[in-house]
């Protein structure tokens, strides 16, 4: 054996490459109850799990909502390798629409081969790029940007008579975030949290604004400065018919501020000693009248300690017929003593019936029947929180600083408003929560193909109501095309006016909304 051959044997040319049998390119054979099948992976196909998103993108483009939001975004980059604003905001939009709750969930979107380019994006950003995007931005500038676009989403509606619901919700936290303080947290007592003070347009279920504060600032007194700044920014013709809230908002400071501005209100009162005395006095009255749904009510005047004046109050009561319901409500009252339950007070008379009571304070002139219904309608605010926290991401997207938590809360609220308005074009008679509207109007397998310069997205929906949507979604597209083609001379705010009039045709009965004057539009 020659020396060259000996060297070749002693020092082989590295390890041989392993030949993988049944790798990703070759596929895999799987034994199923339907027989053996061959599974292959295709990493290059232009497919998406959100095949119907193109209709929503057309909605945003026709109204000018997406372009205005991206162009006015205060995020700036100096590095030539930094992502474009369109890519960052587009990634956030896709993630929120998909129902994600954490930045890490963005990874699931990285290989969507259809929708990013429909939004004008060049790529889907990583979770780190999205998380860091707003870290250096000026907070005041960013808040003004988001507040402005939130108002654009609903401003024409304020020319109609509307009700403002105010409420707060707690977001439990599990780290060392700024503002993560122990406070009122009925779901997880002792757990640090943030609190979201939120204003809603009742019935239409749109978010007007949201403010994120530390977990020990759940009281309405912490939210009132920003709330009254918001109210004062509206002209008289755009202010709500009345403001509605639970017992946290029925305070002297809140009611006096409303009276000073000549804004009507309806609040529930905490059942402290003088309120309970009023209930006891009302028990023997004979002038109880129907308040709807089994409730009866009487009217009285009340001036609590610390109040500047006497105010009209309505005492409501409902007979308790189900002993099991009574036991459950008593258990909840014992375990969460600070919680204002529907059973705020139970009057027990020997050998007599049991009643649950609620006391409302109001400046409205309405009769008791209407006031009782008004307050029961406030339960919709709780449904809003349930949807936004459990279906839209208000329970997540948390960072160490409070600023970015506030930015994401308003961003999610804006996207929620956009999607809610879009879904009403398909389902005008009611609000469809995301758990219903996403499978119906968003989720579907979409495959994109291009031939002779024509791009086609083939959609396959597995929903039982897919045939209905196959006619509803193209009808929305036809309407938007009419707005674009027949109203070329109109500005974006004017087009948005027409679109909102169609969105709320069920409420407006065919009327066109009046032109808003108090928020300047883009166009």
Regions inferred by a protein language model and the residue ranges of each:
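An anionic, glycine-rich sequence signature occurring as long contiguous blocks
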Residues: 2-12, 24-35, 39, 264-390, ...
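Dynamic "connector" segments at or just before major functional cores
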Residues: 2-191, 195-217, 221-236, 423, ...
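Structural motif
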Residues: 78-87, 187, 350-351, 399-408
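Short amphipathic alpha-helical "interface-anchor" segments enriched in bulky aromatics
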Residues: 106, 368-411, 415-419
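Acidic/histidine-rich, metal-coordinating catalytic segments
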Residues: 240-250
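Short, surface-exposed basic-aromatic patches at helix termini and helix-loop junctions that form
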Residues: 255-264
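Basic, amphipathic alpha-helical segments enriched in Lys/Arg and hydrophobic/aromatic residues
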Residues: 395-458, 462-463
């Amino acid at each position: 054996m020659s020396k060259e051959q000996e060297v070749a044997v002693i020092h082989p040319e590295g390890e041989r490459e392993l030949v993988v049998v049944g790798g990703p390119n070759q596929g895999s054979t799987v034994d199923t109850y339907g027989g053996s099948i061959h599974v292959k992976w295709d990493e290059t196909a232009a497919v998406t799990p959100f095949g119907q998103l193109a209709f929503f993108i057309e909605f945003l483009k026709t109204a000018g909502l997406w372009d205005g939001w991206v162009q006015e975004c205060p995020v700036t980059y100096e590095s030539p390798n930094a992502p474009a604003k369109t890519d960052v905001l587009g990634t956030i939009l896709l993630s929120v629409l998909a129902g994600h709750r954490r930045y890490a969930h963005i990874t699931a979107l990285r290989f969507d081969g259809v929708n990013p380019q429909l939004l004008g994006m060049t790529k889907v950003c990583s979770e780190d790029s999205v998380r860091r995007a707003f870290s250096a931005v000026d907070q005041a500038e960013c808040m003004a940007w988001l507040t402005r676009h939130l108002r654009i989403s609903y401003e024409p509606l304020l020319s109609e008579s509307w009700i403002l619901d105010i409420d707060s919700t707690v977001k439990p936290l599990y780290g060392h975030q700024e503002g993560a303080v122990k406070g009122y947290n009925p779901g997880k007592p002792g757990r640090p949290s943030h609190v979201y003070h939120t204003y809603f347009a009742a019935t239409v279920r749109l978010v007007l604004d949201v403010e994120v504060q530390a977990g020990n600032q759940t009281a309405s007194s912490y939210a009132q400065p920003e709330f009254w700044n918001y109210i004062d920014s509206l002209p008289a013709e755009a202010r709500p018919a009345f403001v509605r809230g639970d017992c946290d908002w029925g305070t002297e400071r809140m009611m006096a501020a409303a009276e000073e501005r000549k804004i009507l209100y309806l609040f529930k009162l905490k059942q402290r000693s003088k309120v309970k005395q009023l209930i006891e006095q009302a028990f023997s009255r004979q002038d109880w009248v129907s308040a709807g749904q089994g409730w009866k009510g009487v009217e009285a005047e009340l001036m609590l300690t610390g109040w500047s004046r006497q105010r009209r109050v309505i005492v409501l009561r409902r007979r308790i017929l189900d002993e099991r319901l009574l036991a459950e409500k008593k258990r909840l009252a014992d375990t969460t003593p600070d919680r204002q339950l529907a059973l705020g007070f139970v009057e027990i008379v020997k050998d007599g019936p049991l009643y649950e009571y609620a006391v409302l304070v109001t400046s409205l002139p309405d009769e008791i029947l209407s006031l009782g219904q008004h307050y029961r309608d406030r339960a919709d605010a709780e449904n809003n929180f349930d949807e936004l926290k459990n279906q839209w991401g208000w329970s997540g997207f948390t960072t160490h600083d409070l600023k970015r938590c506030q930015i994401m809360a308003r961003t999610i609220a804006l996207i929620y408003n956009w999607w809610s308005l879009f879904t009403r074009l398909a389902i005008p008679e009611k609000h469809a929560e995301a758990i219903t509207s996403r499978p119906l109007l968003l989720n579907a397998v979409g495959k994109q193909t291009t031939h002779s310069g024509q791009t086609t997205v083939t959609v396959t929906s597995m929903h039982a109501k897919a045939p209905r949507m196959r006619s509803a979604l193209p009808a929305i597209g036809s309407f938007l095309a009419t707005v674009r083609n027949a109203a070329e001379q109109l500005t974006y705010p004017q087009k948005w006016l027409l679109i909102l009039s169609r969105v709320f045709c069920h409420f407006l009965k065919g009327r066109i909304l009046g032109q808003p004057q108090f928020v300047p539009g883009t166009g």
